[in-house]
Regions:
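Short, basic/aromatic recognition patches
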Residues: 4-24, 142-145
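Active-site ligand-binding patch in enzyme domains
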Residues: 144, 154-271
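Flexible, polar/acidic helix-loop-strand segments at domain edges
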Residues: 139-152
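Short beta-strand scaffold segments in enzyme catalytic cores
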Residues: 29-37, 157-158
Length: 271
């Protein structure tokens, strides 16, 4: 049997998606205020350092003349309970007079957690675990970092139906179409917005000679960090990534490779 606030949590999750790439390193969060079975205010975390979803939702309610004390707050992630770039969301929720809060997922960040207990101590009825898997997927990258201190990794792979990326002789051509390539550049731009990186191995670096940048019709807000790994240290002018330096670049190689004159030349160029 579904929870009575499940549909509202799904709407909050859709709102959270709007901040997926811009909220980093914070998690993406969405919130709605519900009164008499109707969503009357909405909010999401738009960018790091700006108001969190709960506060944005309360601002929307104020702009619409909605009394939040007569509403239920539905939010995808437990309201934060600490002073960071912004004040604790729990304070805003309590000050607004909200008496019922429905949460999708508890916050895995020990610095921000404790919101549920804080609200309960203030007399707020709190429910958690509504659409938990959906809300967990929303913040998969944040969860991995908080629990393992590892980066969230996405694999981009293009191959033929028989699992090939080139012929036996090494000859290759575009496998993906124009639409897919455009989507890849959109993904690169979003990864850059989130402060992420693109990583390639030595074969891709030396064979494809990639720039590892996002190239779209509109200006790209922030290019992703370019990272490559190879036991072969290239001459700085032999590859576009090091010759043109279109973005911040990191090159990993062996200890012996790092001691070569070519490696010294790369360092001189800021790699």
């Amino acid at each position: 049997m579904s929870h009575p606030y499940e549909s509202f949590m799904r709407e909050a999750a859709e709102l959270a998606e709007r901040g997926r790439w811009s909220a980093a390193p914070n998690p993406t969060v969405g919130a709605v205020l519900v009164r008499d079975g109707v969503v009357v205010a909405r909010g999401w975390h738009t960018a790091y350092g700006k108001s969190h979803a709960e506060v944005e939702c309360l601002k929307d309610a104020e702009a619409k003349g909605v009394d939040p004390s007569a509403c239920t707050l539905v939010v995808t992630l437990e309201p934060c309970n600490h002073q960071g770039q912004t004040p604790p969301c729990t304070e805003a929720v309590i000050a607004a007079g909200i008496r019922h809060v429905v949460i999708g997922l508890r916050d895995p960040n020990p610095k921000a957690a404790g919101g549920m207990e804080c609200l309960a101590e203030a007399g707020v009825e709190v429910e958690a675990g509504v659409c938990e898997e959906l809300c967990r997927d929303l913040v998969a990258d944040f969860l991995i970092w908080q629990t393992t201190k590892r980066p969230y990794v996405m694999l981009k792979l293009a191959m033929t139906l028989d699992g090939r990326i080139a012929t036996r002789t090494g000859h290759s051509r575009w496998i993906t179409g124009e639409t897919a390539r455009h989507q890849v550049h959109e993904l690169r731009a979003n990864v850059g917005r989130a402060g992420g990186a693109i990583l390639v191995g030595g074969n891709t670096l030396h064979t494809d000679n990639p720039l590892l940048t996002a190239r779209l019709d509109d200006p790209v807000e922030r290019q992703p960090l370019a990272v490559s790994i190879s036991s072969r240290v290239p001459a700085p002018d032999s590859l576009l990534l090091f010759k043109e330096r279109p973005t911040e670049t990191i090159f990993f190689t062996t200890a012996s490779g790092a001691a070569t004159p070519r490696a010294a030349q790369l360092r001189e160029r800021g790699v």
